[in-house]
Amino acid sequence: DLIFTGGYGKDSVYRFMEEKNKAADLMPYLEKDQEFADSVAPEIISYWQKDGKLYTLSDVLLLGGGYWYNADIFEKAGIESVPETWDEFLEACEKIQSWSQNEGKSVIPVQITKENSAYLADALLLDTSKEAQDAVENHSMMLSAKELFPVLETMKQIRQYGDSTDKNYGYRDEGSMFNSGNTAMYINGVWASKLIDEKIDACYAPFPGKNGSTIASSSVCLGYIVGNTGNQETMDASVEFLKYMLSEKVQKRILLETGQMPSSPKIHLEEYKEQIPRMCNAVEAIRGADRIIEVPDNLWTADQLENFRNQIMEVLNGTLDEEQFCTNLYQ
């Protein structure tokens, strides 16, 4: 009767239910209940509404497309301001590396992983060419080697400032390295705020871009789907549960207890700045970016994203040819 996808299944479960009329259209419920409608994020409507119909709602926003940085390390390394271009980003990495070596420390500037790689690639793609920009903005990532090669080259440059052992790092490993002061930057979203030690002077920055035009991501991924069972009583009950999840009471708990950004526009972050200043500042940094794009899960198909993440580290360390990587991406 009610499915929670957790952000997965856009190209499988969701597509099947949409095509086979197995998902209930939620728009009639929103049209009849203004209070319910006011609890739904505009991002949900703009991305998921199709032909006037809406088959999913989510209780959280995904805010990312940037990185956490250790302000204390930045200061010690002589970085006076957050990088606004990729050249400045690489210069910051060089400064951190030089400072670390001079001080006899083992601090690495930044670590690319299979998990954060697509966020980085999407930001780089936006400034590669008009074709690549259109692909990102139109959520259709059919890219040629011409668009992908410059992105891979920049990612190789950034990778040189990470751990060269090519361990299969995950976001928790990155978080642990950041908390121990062994890495200066931590590519992740707002939701990672809860993972960062309070003793770290951690700030958030969107990705840099061409001519200083910064880039971040704000999305609503696939969430709850109400089954179109034909049983009006159970369908209505499922919708009541969605109303509950989007209520201010629950949305506030999501914010304060999980560190995720609630999707309801009724939650005003300025009211919580004293309680969760780090997260609030991170959200402000993302919303202050010059350009906002979707998160990778809303840009790439599930197969494309899996292929990208499974092979990106091989391409960056030189064990997989770039041309072959581009071919494999769409298989």
Predicted regions and their residues:
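Paired acidic/hydrophobic, glycine-rich loop segments that form the ligand-binding mouth/hinge
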Residues: 1-4, 184-189
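Short, solvent-exposed loop/beta-turn-alpha elements that line the ligand-binding surface or hinge
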Residues: 25-40, 81, 100-101, 109-110, ...
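Long, aromatic- and glycine/proline-rich binding clefts that accommodate carbohydrate-like moieties
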Residues: 205, 255-309, 313-314
